[in-house]
């Protein structure tokens, strides 16, 4: 198996949003494929569940893979194939197994099986194994599990895993209507596509002995198996789409950079062998080995992901940062009228914001004061900054000082001017500037105040200081 070019496969079902766990599996498979010039990453869409499949989910899979850098134009990429297109081959193999005596027909109902076993949790008892039933209505095809055993799965991550045949029932491989079950279709497709490595989540480990038996029954050498550790939340519960934020698209829509997501997902269960954490995928590929993947559960820590993302944002040059922010600035995501947005103003403020945000969507709250007609109303910030004896007095004095036509409207002179006002009020600059910041930007936290005043302009600053004073006076009446 190791003499052949690596052929990995990623086989998602188009039945929902693209899960971060699936993203990690795809990346691990992609990394293996990239390690050899002839290595292949095969994308197979397992679309046999017609009732749940939707075309937009398939499109979403392709978009998500592309965002992760798994590009269908890359020579290492093969597919996408669709499992439904191989239905005839699945039936053909099922019939072959029957002819060879490796499978048999069974007409037992679920109720009959449970009645014989006396326990609904016990599996099939092999009742039809030697009855010699022919194909017919109501007769499913079961694989004849060999007596003896065990089946040994050599897992690259978990080591040697034994499955006693007494615990493996003669499992159904085709329904009574002839349609194959997933366990058979999956193996047939892997054989047909010459897959050498099956790298997937540990929830599939229980199916592996059945699939290995099928590989062997078809006269094929089983692939390299590797079952990845489960991904858990902060409560150490398996990530669930009903409870946790698990859709890759949700993270990207929030402003997590694809390269940061790739970096973080690659480290869920694997590490490069040293203390490095922030590193590009291209440097991870030659270091990646399945044997180095941890079998213990991997904690999806969004706080750590945010920290990773912040590092990647700060590493962007200013031009690229501006481009990456564009989706949040000029669309329905922006809270200001489109005509208010000034690209030159944003380019000027971008370096100040770039060092402060962890996800791109946060850019809006840092720069909205520049493009809104009035600053946002944040009552908590207002109450904190506009203390009696400070708020009104500081705003009045600041407005008077900022109205001086001889005051140069740049950050440094503005800071010096406000320091003078603060000293006259007997206040330190930090406490003195809070009312001005809230009056002008609406928030107690944000970009450097004096650069913000410079960009906003003299007339708009004066207008907002007056409006804040009027609000204070109205509240005191």
From Swiss-Prot:
Residues that bind Zn(2+): 106, 108, 128, 130
Species this protein is from: Thermobifida fusca (strain YX)
GO cellular component, one term: cytosol
Required cofactor names: Zn(2+)
Compartments reported by the entry: Cytoplasm
HAMAP family registered for this protein in UniProt: Glu_tRNA_synth_type1 (MF_00022)
Entry protein name: Glutamate--tRNA ligase
Entry note: cofactor: Binds 1 zinc ion per subunit.
NCBIfam families in alphabetical order: gltX_bact
UniProt entry tagged with the keyword rRNA-binding: no
UniProt GO BP: glutamyl-tRNA aminoacylation
Gene: gltX
Motif 'KMSKS' region: chain residues: 238-242
InterPro entries associated with the record: aa-tRNA-synth_I_cd-bd (IPR045462), aa-tRNA-synth_I_codon-bd_sub2 (IPR020751), aa-tRNA-synth_I_CS (IPR001412), aa_tRNA-synth_I_cd-bd_sf (IPR008925), Glu-tRNA-ligase_bac/mito (IPR004527), Glu-tRNA-synth_I_codon-bd_sub1 (IPR020752), Glu/Gln-tRNA-synth (IPR000924), Glu/Gln-tRNA-synth_Ib_cat-dom (IPR020058)
Catalytic activity from the UniProt record: tRNA(Glu) + L-glutamate + ATP = L-glutamyl-tRNA(Glu) + AMP + diphosphate
Similarity-based family: Belongs to the class-I aminoacyl-tRNA synthetase family. Glutamate--tRNA ligase type 1 subfamily.
Assembly information from the UniProt record: Monomer.
Keywords: Aminoacyl-tRNA synthetase, ATP-binding, Cytoplasm, Ligase, Metal-binding, Nucleotide-binding, Protein biosynthesis, Zinc
């Amino acid at each position: 198996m190791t003499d052949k070019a690596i052929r990995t496969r990623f086989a998602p079902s188009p039945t929902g949003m693209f899960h971060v766990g699936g993203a990690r599996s795809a990346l691990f498979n992609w990394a293996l494929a990239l390690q050899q010039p002839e290595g292949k990453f095969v994308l197979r869409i397992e679309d046999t569940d017609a009732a749940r499949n939707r075309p937009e989910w398939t499109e979403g899979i392709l978009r998500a893979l592309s965002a992760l850098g798994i590009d269908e134009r890359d020579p290492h990429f093969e597919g996408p194939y669709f499992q439904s297109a191989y239905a005839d081959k699945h039936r053909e193999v099922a019939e072959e197994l029957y002819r060879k005596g490796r499978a048999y027909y069974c007409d037992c109902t679920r109720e009959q099986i449970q009645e014989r076993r006396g326990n609904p949790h016990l599996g099939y008892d092999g009742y039809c194994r030697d009855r010699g039933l022919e194909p017919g209505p109501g007769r499913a095809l079961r694989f004849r599990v060999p007596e003896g055993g065990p089946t040994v799965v050599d897992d690259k991550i978990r080591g040697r895993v034994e499955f006693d045949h007494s615990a493996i029932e003669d499992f159904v491989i085709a329904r009574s209507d002839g349609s194959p079950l997933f366990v058979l279709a999956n193996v047939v497709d892997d054989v047909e596509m010459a897959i050498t490595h099956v790298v997937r989540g540990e929830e599939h480990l229980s199916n592996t002995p059945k699939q290995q038996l099928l590989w062997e029954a078809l006269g094929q050498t089983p692939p390299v198996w590797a079952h990845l550790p489960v991904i858990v939340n902060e409560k150490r519960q398996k990530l669930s789409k009903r409870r946790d934020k698990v859709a890759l698209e949700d993270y990207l829509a929030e402003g997590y950079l694809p390269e940061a997501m790739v970096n973080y997902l690659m480290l869920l269960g694997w590490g490069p062998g040293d203390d490095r954490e922030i590193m590009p995928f291209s440097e991870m590929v030659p270091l990646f080995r399945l044997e180095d993947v941890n079998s213990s559960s991997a904690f999806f820590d969004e706080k750590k992901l945010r920290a990773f993302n912040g590092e990647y944002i700060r590493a962007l040059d200013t031009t690229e940062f501006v481009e990456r922010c564009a989706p949040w600035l000029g669309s329905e995501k922006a809270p200001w009228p489109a005509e208010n947005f000034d690209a030159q103003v944003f380019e000027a403020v971008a370096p100040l914001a770039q060092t402060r945000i962890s996800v791109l969507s946060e850019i809006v709250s840092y720069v909205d004061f520049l493009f809104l007609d009035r600053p946002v109303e944040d009552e908590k910030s207002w109450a904190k900054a506009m203390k009696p004896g400070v708020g009104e007095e500081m705003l009045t004095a600041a407005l008077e000082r900022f109205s001086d036509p001889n005051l140069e409207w740049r950050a440094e002179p503005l800071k010096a001017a406000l320091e003078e006002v603060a000293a006259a009020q007997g206040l330190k600059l930090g406490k003195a500037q809070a009312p001005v910041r809230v009056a002008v930007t609406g928030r107690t936290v944000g970009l450097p105040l004096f650069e913000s005043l410079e960009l906003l302009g003299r007339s708009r600053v004066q207008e907002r200081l007056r409006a804040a004073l009027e609000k204070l006076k109205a509240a005191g009446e």
